[in-house]
Swiss-Prot record:
Coiled coil: none annotated. The gene is rplQ. GO terms for cellular component: cytosolic large ribosomal subunit. One of its GO terms (biological process) is translation. It comes from Borrelia hermsii (strain HS1 / DAH). This is Large ribosomal subunit protein bL17. Keywords: Ribonucleoprotein, Ribosomal protein. One of its GO terms (molecular function) is structural constituent of ribosome.
Length: 123
């Protein structure tokens, strides 16, 4: 009997899926906005929310836990010093998915994933 899985497999092997999600989360924190298919972005949103919640308390333990997922030291430092202080008072909902419509080639649902507070615009 088939049972429901708690996440979307995205038609990939587990190692490919993990690498895809890690790279997309790093791109989100680097550029503060990414565009992709809605299915991928809804999975990336889950991981990004967990990482931002973990980064709100800056401790050695939390840095090590987040660094298991984010291997880029520059992005890790940006998450803990610039992104997470913006969301100190917010309990959740740090990231939003905005639907764009369908892609021309294969009619896949496209969307934008962005951080909610846009105070990081000064680069």
């Amino acid at each position: 009997m088939k049972t429901k899985v708690g996440f979307n497999r995205l038609n990939r092997k587990s190692s490919h899926r993990k690498a895809l999600l890690k790279n997309m989360v790093i791109s989100l924190f680097k550029h503060e906005k990414i565009t992709s298919t809605k299915a991928k972005l809804s999975e990336v949103k889950r991981f990004a929310e967990k990482l931002i919640t973990r980064a709100k308390i800056d401790s050695v333990h939390n840095r090590r836990e987040v660094s298991k997922f984010i291997h880029d030291k520059f992005i890790l430092n940006k998450l803990f010093t610039k992104i997470s202080p913006i969301f100190k008072e917010r309990k959740g909902g740090y990231v939003r998915v905005i639907k764009l419509g369908r892609r021309y080639g294969d009619a896949a649902e496209m969307a934008i994933l962005e951080l909610v507070d846009k105070t990081l615009e000064e680069k």
